[in-house]
C-alpha cells in the first residue's frame, strides 16, 4: 500500500498450492502465501480458487478458475497446452474510468434490513449447504411466470427470508438482497478486473406479502427499473466521482481506510444477504466430460451472515449457501420451496451445520465450542484485568 492509495505490484514468486484443511473463504493475509491476493488449494478431486475481491470480481475469478482447471487436465492427460499470449492481459484495464461520465449528483439512502437470526458458528468455520438442480426444470418454471432465472431465484430467496425471519404478517425492517450486476453485459468490455455494480432488491417494511407471486411481481419490477444502462451509468458516475474529488485524493490512506470501513459497515447493514448469479462456466469441449461441476462460494460477513452464489455448468445449476450461522433454516426453506414448485434439488454440505447431506468431499473441521467460548471469556477477562 502507498501513502494515499492501495495498489498492486507484480509478484515474480511461485504461488504455493496446498491441500485444503480449513473452512472456505478464510481471510487472505497479504503477508503470507508468497504475498499473493489469492489462494489455490485442492481436496480430493476438487480444485479451489479463492481470491481477494480487490483483484477481480466473480466473472473474472470464474474465467481464471476455468482456465486453471483446463490447464490441470492438459497436464494430467498429456494433451497439448493451449495458450493465448494476451489471455489475461485485460486485468489491467479500469473500465470504471473508461465509462465514467460526469452526471448530475444523485443521493443514495439506505436503512437497516432484516438479519438472519440464530447462533453464530465458532471462529474460523463456515457452513456450506448447496443444492444442485437441472437448468431445464428451472427454466420450465420460469416460463410459467414469464421471468428470468435471476428474477425467479431472487424472489424465491426473499420469500424464504420473509417466511423464516418474520411472523408472516408484518416486517419491522425490509428484507433486502444485495444483487451484483455484471457491467460487461451493458458496456463493451473484456476486462478481467472488477467491473460490476450492485443493486438493492427488497420487500419494504410493513405488510408482509401474501404469496410468492406477489414477491415475484415486486422483484421483477425493481430489477426492470434498476438494471438498465442509464441507471448503471449513474452508479458508475457516483462511485468514480467520489474518487476524483481532490480532497479525497489528498487524504492519507489510513484515514481513507477507516472511512471505507464505516461505509462498508453501513451499506452491509442495508442487506439481509447477497445473491450472486455469475451465469454459466465454460470448459473447452474436449474436456467437458472431465469436469463434474462448479460452485461459487461467497464469504459471509458480520452483517450479512449468510450469502448465496449460483453458477451453471453442463445443464446443472449449483446454488451454494455460505453461512456463519449454526442453523440452516433459510436454505432449507428455500430448497423445499423449489421442490414444491416441481424443481428437484440434490443437496450437499461440508458437514459443519448439516451432517445428513455431507458426502465427505470437504475437509473435516472439528472444534470444541465449549473450549472456544471459555477461551473467549478468558480473553475478555484478561482485558478487564489489564485495564484495571
Question: What are these regions, as identified by a protein language model?
Answer:
Residues 131-206:
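Long, internal scaffold/assembly segments composed of regular secondary structure
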Residues 369-375, 380-383:
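N-terminal amphipathic/hydrophobic targeting modules at extreme N-termini
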Residues 128, 195-279, 286:
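Helical lid/core segments from catalytic subdomains that handle acyl or acyl-like groups
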Residues 1-16, 81-133, 179, 185:
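Short amphipathic alpha-helices and their capping loops
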Residues 1-91, 139-143, 150-173, 278-365, ...:
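Non-catalytic N-terminal regions of enzymes
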Residues 187, 262-266, 297-298:
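Short proline/glycine-enriched turn/loop segments at secondary-structure junctions
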Amino acid at each position: 500500500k502507498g501513502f494515499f492509495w492501495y495498489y498492486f505490484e507484480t509478484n515474480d514468486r511461485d504461488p504455493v498450492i496446498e491441500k485444503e484443511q480449513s473452512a472456505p473463504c478464510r481471510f487472505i493475509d497479504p503477508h503470507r502465501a508468497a504475498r499473493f491476493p489469492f489462494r489455490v488449494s485442492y481436496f480430493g478431486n476438487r480444485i479451489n480458487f479463492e481470491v481477494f475481491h480487490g483483484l477481480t470480481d466473480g466473472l473474472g475469478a470464474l474465467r481464471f478458475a476455468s482456465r486453471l482447471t483446463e490447464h490441470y487436465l492438459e497436464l494430467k492427460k498429456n494433451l497439448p497446452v493451449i495458450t493465448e499470449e494476451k489471455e489475461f492481459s485485460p486485468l489491467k484495464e479500469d473500465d470504471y474510468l473508461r465509462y465514467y461520465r460526469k452526471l448530475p449528483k444523485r443521493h443514495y439512502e439506505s436503512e437497516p434490513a432484516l438479519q438472519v437470526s440464530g447462533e453464530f458458528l465458532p471462529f474460523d468455520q463456515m457452513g456450506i449447504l448447496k443444492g444442485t438442480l437441472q437448468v431445464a426444470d428451472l427454466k420450465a418454471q420460469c416460463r410459467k411466470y414469464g421471468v428470468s432465472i435471476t428474477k425467479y431465484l431472487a424472489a424465491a430467496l426473499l420469500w424464504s427470508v420473509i417466511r423464516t425471519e418474520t411472523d408472516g404478517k408484518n416486517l419491522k425492517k425490509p428484507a433486502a438482497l444485495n444483487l451484483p450486476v455484471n457491467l460487461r453485459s451493458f458496456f463493451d468490455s473484456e476486462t478481467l478486473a472488477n467491473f460490476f455494480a450492485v443493486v438493492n432488491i427488497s420487500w419494504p417494511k410493513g405488510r408482509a406479502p401474501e404469496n410468492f407471486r406477489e414477491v415475484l411481481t415486486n422483484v421483477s419490477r425493481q430489477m426492470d427499473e434498476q438494471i438498465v444502462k442509464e441507471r448503471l451509468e449513474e452508479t458508475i458516475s457516483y462511485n468514480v466521482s467520489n474518487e476524483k474529488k481532490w480532497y479525497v485524493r489528498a487524504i492519507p490512506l489510513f484515514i481513507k481506510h477507516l472511512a471505507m470501513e464505516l461505509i462498508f459497515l453501513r451499506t452491509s447493514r442495508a442487506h439481509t444477504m447477497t445473491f450472486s448469479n455469475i451465469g454459466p462456466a465454460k470448459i473447452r469441449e474436449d474436456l467437458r466430460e472431465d469436469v463434474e461441476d462448479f460452485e461459487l462460494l461467497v464469504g459471509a460477513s458480520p452483517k450479512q451472515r449468510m450469502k448465496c452464489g449460483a453458477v451453471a455448468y453442463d445443464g446443472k445449476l449449483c446454488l451454494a449457501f455460505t453461512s456463519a450461522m449454526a442453523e440452516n433454516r433459510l436454505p432449507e426453506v428455500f430448497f423445499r420451496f423449489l421442490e414444491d414448485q416441481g424443481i428437484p434439488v440434490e443437496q450437499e454440505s461440508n458437514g459443519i451445520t448439516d451432517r445428513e447431506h455431507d458426502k465427505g468431499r470437504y475437509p473435516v473441521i472439528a472444534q470444541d465450542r465449549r473450549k472456544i467460548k471459555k477461551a473467549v471469556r478468558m480473553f475478555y477477562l484478561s482485558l478487564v484485568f489489564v485495564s484495571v
